Amino acid sequence: MSVAIRALTVEDWRALRELRLHALRTDPGVFFSTYDAEVLWPDSRWIALAGGDDTRQLFGLVDDGRLVGISGVFVDRDEPSGEAVVLGMSYILPKYRRRGFASRFYEARLAWVRAAARFRRVKVGHRRSNEASRRAIERFGFRWTADEPRRWPDGGDEDYVAYELLLREPGAE
């Protein structure tokens, strides 16, 4: 088995769509979106998402050419300064879990953020009951910032636990 993590490109859009829709169907309680919403997306949206740009990059876990995991980094649209990014859209097929690939996704995403050099903060979070996410987040030095009550797309009411990693102090160059 030859497993690698790499940045996705526009050529990956069909595989991205297939895996993302699978994730939303099988694990609806861990995402902010739903299968019913994303299945309606036009191909052009998937192509743009897979292609990445200076506001986002998706990464894929690829096993012998097959996409088996995805994770992304996105400029935080709610942050007026443009200096913050959000990590999300993470999913790994069950067969590939508990093998260190989540850590490799963190490494790839944080490398992208640092290479961009304009970002100061990295945000991430999880549903309170998602212990695997909590462990990965804390392992990479993120600090808790808030518990936010949330109704999840699966209908469950459970806190969203927010974290932040400060890359550089405000005003530091």
How should these model regions be labeled?
Residues K123-G125, R143-D159:
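Conserved catalytic-core motifs of GNAT/GCN5-like acyltransferases
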Residues L93-K95, R99, R128-S129:
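Active-site acidic-Proline motif in GNAT/NAT acetyltransferases
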Residues V10-E11, E18, A23-K95, Y106-A108, ...:
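Acetyl-CoA-dependent GNAT
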Residues V113-G125:
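Conserved GNAT acetyl-CoA-binding A-motif
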Residues S103-R104, R128-A146:
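Conserved active-site alpha-helix within GNAT-family acetyltransferase domains
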